[in-house]
Amino acid sequence: MAHQGMDTALFERRLRPIYDNLEVGNNRKALQESEKLLRKHPSMLCARALKGLALLRLGRYEESHGCLQAVAEDKPTDDSTLQVLSFCYREMEQLNKIVELYQHAVKKNPGNEELLAHLFISYVRVEDYKAQQAVALQLYKAQPKNAYYFWSVISVVFQGIRGPESAVPEKRKIYLGLAQRMVEKHIREGKLESEQEAFLYLHILKLQKKFQEAWEFLTGELCAKLYPGAPVSMKFELLKVLGNWRELNELLQQLLDADRDRWDYYKEYIQSCFEILKLPITEGATEEKKFSLSACQEFLQGIIDSSERKKRGPYLARLELHQRMRAHQLPADQLIGDFDELVVEYFSLFADKSCCTHDIALFLPSVSMKQRQALANKLLLESGVSSTSLPMNKEQMQKHICALQISRMCGAHIDLPIDHLLAFYTALKLHYEHGRSTFGNKLLSTEMGPSDPYALLAANVMYDISLRENKSDYLFEALCLLQYVLRNSTSNFHVKLLSLKIYHMFGCLLGAQEMYEYLDIKQIQLDSMGYVHCQLLPLCGRFSGARNSYDTTMKFFTNSYKERLEYIALTYRFCTFSKMEEFLNFKERLTNSLQYVTCSLEAQICDLVSCYANVHQNLSTYTVMSIEPAEDRIAWHELSDNRDLDAIIRWDPLHQVDADAERKDSFDQEIEVLQLRSLMLRLYATFIDLYHPPPITKPSLSDGSKEETPAPAVESATSTLELLRDSWTGLYQRLRLMNYKPLPQQFLVNLLPTRLHLLLELPYERFFDDLAQLVLDLHSGAASLAAHCKKVGDNVIAVMELCVRTIEESNEWNNKDGLWKRRYQQQKVAASLEMLSLYAFLLSVLNDKLQVSSKTKVKKKQGDNKTQDTPQPVSEKERSQMVQELMRQLKHKLEACDAAIRTWKAPVLPRDLSSFMADMSLKPEVEATLIGDVSATFKDSHELMVTELRNLLKDKIRMVAK
């Protein structure tokens, strides 16, 4: 035994250099060290596994796979080798192989606690709850620990609520009932030990809607002993479900006495008061209804009067009570006072805080438009700043800002004439500059300027004017103002978000990309806020620039997927049952994120559009994508909308904003766009697969000749193509019948239109439908092939003419307004080139295949002559010639597009710089450089786009010219 221990220590010392090199990222050195060690000890499994890891990190995937497979086949049992193999399989996302590893190891060592624990966690990663339960019970029998017992309990719970049988109510009931009995057995035996175990029991009871039992356990001695820190919200929830409103009311009064600024408690308290009103009146309690609300008012007033420092909570609660009483047609003014006076009082106390606007906005929908505007005027008077005066201090400035924001929310700016709006804009600029110079000195780089909201409001006003006049000059001026603010207040993300939005509206991808990078969006924000940029990149005119942004986003999702699995595993290791469902739901939301699925799909389309090498290299790139045309991998009914649409602050009129409807409409349209793009990619993939099928896993023949694709596989590819083609035309028919409306663009903060209407307007449907027929005819040699070649050729001409015509229109618009329709024009050009680029790649694949086939001479048998009535298939040689003719035609059309793009003029600003500088009224030394820099960004963005599009066309011309 001592000798064995000495050998283990010796091997660990020899493995140390490999581990050290892998840890610092020196993978090549790690590979050399592992090979050096294996020359001396060729049977050392851990060294072989480390070699496989080094190869994996060097990108030598096939060698790595072979090395790891050889080690796995030896069925190792030592912890070091198993850990290295597990790490490799996690990197490769082959989680089932980790399960197999530990299954073999456990068979050799059935009672090994550590191996069983690893096997359990491996089942956790693949969400096999039934297997989890079995292994957990094995563990408990081997080592009777509470943790293992409750692993089996939670596994039973998850079988009931998340497993494959969870949709069957009877099965769900059986599993949850079993889990409850398992815990109760432990309780009877006096083995319940921790607060997480108590939480799990409560959770099981609530899942079965046994709320009375849950309440009794929560308020019992055992729970008080094990779970003294049970969240109060758990009591709220149970009391509400059980209808114990009086008890809830008393509990909330106690809590509010202790913590007087809890707005969430106040809302629950007021709700309990109104629920008490609905209870049947008992004998001797005829004044109960009146008492309930008057007691509520007295309680709130008592908190206000007795508080040393003024806190928002009770004042907001009083407004909430007033609002609810009016909704129930109760005499609110008589009991509490005039609503306007309450709001003005709240404003006078708390308007020096930026949250005041949002607070007051909560209660505006409950009053009429006339009352809202009257209230807005009262608040402007209360701020103490008139049209002829400036704020005297920072607090007064914040009050004025709050009053202006509420005024806009009340609709005060909607009906103003344009000259009044322009005067208002000028006043806002003046207030911004005054506030910046007076109260914004010596700010830290991380602080926002106190007067920045004036500029944000000004940008919204200028958008209103631009929309009325259908001109870009006012909005361009707003963009320049925002860039000026950003120079003074580098951390104001509201300014960055609005600037990003305006750059996208004007089709300036370079400016948008700079703002997006300036926002420094990281981690989960790539999912919740990435939509502000990534969803606007497809068909923006810069395929490689878009691809880089997709890479950043997808890298987060890929890395976080592995991290999320480990977080879930850790919740089991530490028995944190209260967090398990939260982590599992979080994992599912990210896995099914619309942002992730869209970026992944558009990245694949970008790669196919941008292919520039020879046909065999391009086919290798295509093969790596692993597109399965017959399989729709998107879980459409589980797609998750994780966008944070409140990230961009807004003060638009409340009666004209329906945020929920806007979210739903945009999400529905984005899903339809995703369906179109996904189906287009799968349909296109069938074109390629029909002529270059995916590699067959069977070994190649001994004589070295290529193995031909079996006839059933060809028939399957053909039927898949026909099926997807029908789905393609059917989807377009359905979308036209759905008659989706473009997203409203009434305000600056509204989401930009989706690509749905653009994709319906452009000839995508006809182009790919006719292309599908051409591919089928080329494959079968149908007699109608020549006619379909002409039809496809006509489509190519139409797409080329669309591209040229759009560029000509853009140049004409430059004489009027070069920015207002710029984004739409760029999208049409990019879409045209996308279709032509995909067509060029397909023709190169067809030509390569047909050239090889046409050289193979087929000898006819003597009895194989057919009658003249039977149409003969077009010969391989003729098909090859037809494809080459299509390539020649495409080459000329691509050259025509290139010539048109050469003439595409950069956007011209609608007015000269001196006119803009006169309107900006900012510091003279700043104005020239500021507006010049913004103008240069537009020019550089156009030049980058033209260069990239021309390079794309040159690659495609080279591709079809070979």
UniProtKB/Swiss-Prot annotation:
- UniProt keyword annotation of Transit peptide present: no
The record's region (Disordered) falls at: 856-880
Q: Mind telling me which Gene3D superfamilies this protein's record contains?
A: 1.25.40.1040
Q: Name one GO biological process term.
A: immune response
Question: Do you know which Pfam families this protein is assigned to?
Answer: NatB_MDM20
Whom does it interact with, and what assembly results? Component of the N-terminal acetyltransferase B (NatB) complex.
The name of this protein is Phagocyte signaling-impaired protein
